[in-house]
């Protein structure tokens, strides 16, 4: 999705324009060959359809989730998924940047295994007890079956929240750094739109409002439900 500067003004399609200066901004998006090959195999070889092109999922999600006004004012669409976090930036009505960060909600689960939990138990603990801040249930404990499957032990919710909050802060900080590196940090007047399974963690909205208060005028949480 290239965009252009025509005599200093942003244009999506400069065709037929008269200008003394034309600058094209083009994003190069890379992906492993294996991913494209698998898509082509399924669509063309197995389904017998013609593949017109392959579009990056984060950009498509952002294009349908953000309103035209948000895109024009400057907005950041963040999909905090299980293993990755996608950041898509729009400004002046056009796509500006995409970055996929190599961590997400699963990293919270992996961090919780440091409490001598299996990954399966850590995920269950995350879903039932973890929060994105440490200011709740500080004195609360819960009992879980030990690794031997026989004995039991108690774990403080505060310890769980410390791991979860630290990781969530790191993810948010990397999103901020991505926007800052793009050079439009102070121009995001349309705010941030957050979605993905990672934001289902308790008190995530509280953490977001705390961490992004200096550079966002609006924070929105989107949760999509598959009705099927």
Label each PLM-derived region with a short phrase:
Residues 1-76, 118, 132-161, 182-185, ...:
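Nucleotide/phosphate-binding catalytic cleft detector across ATP-hydrolyzing
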Residues 66-97, 112:
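Gly/Thr-rich phosphate-binding beta-strand-loop-beta motif of the actin/hexokinase/Hsp70
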């Amino acid at each position: 999705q290239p965009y252009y500067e025509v005599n200093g003004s942003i244009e999506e399609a400069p065709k037929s324009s008269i200008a003394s200066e034309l600058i094209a901004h083009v994003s190069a998006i890379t992906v492993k060959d294996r991913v494209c090959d698998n898509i082509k195999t399924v669509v063309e070889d197995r389904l017998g359809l013609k593949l017109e092109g392959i579009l990056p999922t984060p950009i498509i999600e952002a294009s349908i989730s953000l309103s035209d006004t948000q895109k024009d004012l400057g907005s950041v669409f963040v999909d905090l998924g299980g293993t990755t976090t996608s950041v898509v930036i729009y400004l002046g009505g056009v796509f500006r940047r995409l970055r996929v960060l190599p961590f997400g909600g699963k990293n919270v689960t992996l961090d919780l295994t440091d409490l001598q939990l299996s990954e399966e138990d850590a995920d269950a603990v995350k879903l039932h007890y973890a929060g994105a801040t440490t200011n709740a249930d500080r004195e609360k404990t819960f009992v879980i079956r030990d690794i031997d499957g026989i004995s039991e032990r108690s774990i403080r919710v505060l310890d769980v929240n410390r791991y979860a909050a630290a990781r969530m802060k790191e993810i948010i900080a990397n999103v901020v750094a991505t926007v800052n590196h793009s050079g439009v940090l102070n121009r995001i007047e349309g705010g941030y739109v957050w979605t993905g399974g990672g934001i289902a963690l308790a008190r995530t909205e509280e953490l977001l409002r705390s961490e992004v208060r200096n550079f966002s005028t609006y924070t929105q949480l989107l949760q999509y439900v598959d009705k099927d």
